[in-house]
Regions:
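Carbohydrate-binding surfaces in secreted/extracellular proteins
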Residues: 1-2, 92, 190-224
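Extracellular glycan-recognition surfaces and repeat-rich motifs
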Residues: 3-58, 63-64
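Trp-centered recognition loops
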Residues: 85-88, 93, 174-202
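Secretory/extracellular carbohydrate-interaction modules
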Residues: 55-173
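Solvent-exposed loop and beta-edge segments used for protein-protein assembly and interaction
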Residues: 51-53, 83-88, 106-108, 193-197, ...
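Residue-level detector of short, conserved catalytic/binding motifs and their immediate flanks
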Residues: 88-90, 112, 134, 199-201, ...
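Ligand-recognition surfaces built from glycine- and aromatic
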Residues: 226-258
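Boundary/junction segments of secreted and surface-exposed precursor proteins
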Residues: 1-4, 237
């Protein structure tokens, strides 16, 4: 309900060439609005906002620049000066907004991302070759060849998107029967995808088991520690948003996550 921006670290990454004149514009092509009144977009109070406040953190990416400098990018938010280990979890109410009807419109596919065991010093998103910790991602309208992502960084800092079998994940596309059941139509505009609705999201580490939970259903679970890859099992949590594509949404103001 209040502006807590001073308590967060914000980092961004882009696939633009660092030597390109448009690099700085691409790297800064995001917005993070703390204490945003999302009722102005017709969104009801989040189910876990005890005081029924309609304020939250709104994030958008790759929507500010209409020039050829528009590039795929991601942005991460980390709580400042926080470190966790052992059994812990990050839980949020998430609303992914997208332009267009069921299945989305022009440039609608963007992913909300969330993770743990991060250093808070590196950006985690799909096109970043290095990073740390673990994180997951989901789009709002099933518009990608991979709607549900799982990422992991090894002890050398190399980031890999994990296939569902290694991630312990149900599947990667919104057409999977479990996602179709979890996010049914017409309650959800795009069946199998969580967009344009409040969805509870939890990423937890419990007795060396890493789990991703949405609306109470475990959709990914695997050992938190991985001796082969040397995955981190302590650190801070991360919330974020990423656009895997250079295209701009139209209308661009409809694409964001709260």
């Amino acid at each position: 309900n209040t502006d807590t921006s001073a308590n967060w670290i914000v980092l961004s990454g882009t696939n633009a060439d660092e030597n390109d004149d448009a690099y700085d514009a691409a790297l800064g092509d995001f917005t993070v609005d703390f204490a945003f009144d999302y009722s102005t977009r017709g969104i009801p109070p989040a189910p876990n906002s005890g005081d029924k406040s309609t304020r939250g953190v709104r994030i958008s990416v790759n929507n500010n620049d209409d020039t050829t400098g528009s590039e795929a990018m991601g942005v991460n938010l980390f709580p400042a000066k926080q470190n966790f280990s052992g059994n812990y979890a990050v839980r949020v109410d998430m609303w992914i907004n997208y332009n267009g009807p069921a299945g989305g419109g022009t440039g609608s596919t963007e992913h909300a991302i969330f993770g743990m065991n991060q250093s808070g010093e590196q950006v985690g998103w799909s096109s970043q070759p290095t990073g740390d910790g673990v994180w997951f991602g989901v789009d709002g309208e099933g518009g990608s060849s991979t709607d549900y992502y799982s990422f992991e960084a090894d002890d050398s800092g190399t980031v890999s998107p994990l296939p569902p079998d290694l991630a312990g994940m149900v599947g990667k596309n919104n057409t999977h029967p479990v996602y179709q059941f979890l996010f049914p139509s017409p309650a959800f505009e795009t069946q199998g995808a969580p967009g344009k609705n409040w969805v509870s999201v939890e990423v937890r580490q419990d007795d060396d088991v890493l789990s991703w939970v949405m609306n109470g259903m475990v959709i990914a679970s695997r050992p938190a520690s991985d001796e082969f890859f040397g995955v981190r099992t302590e650190g801070t949590v991360m919330l974020g948003y990423m656009d895997l594509f250079n295209s701009i949404a139209n209308p661009k103001e409809d694409n964001f996550v709260v």
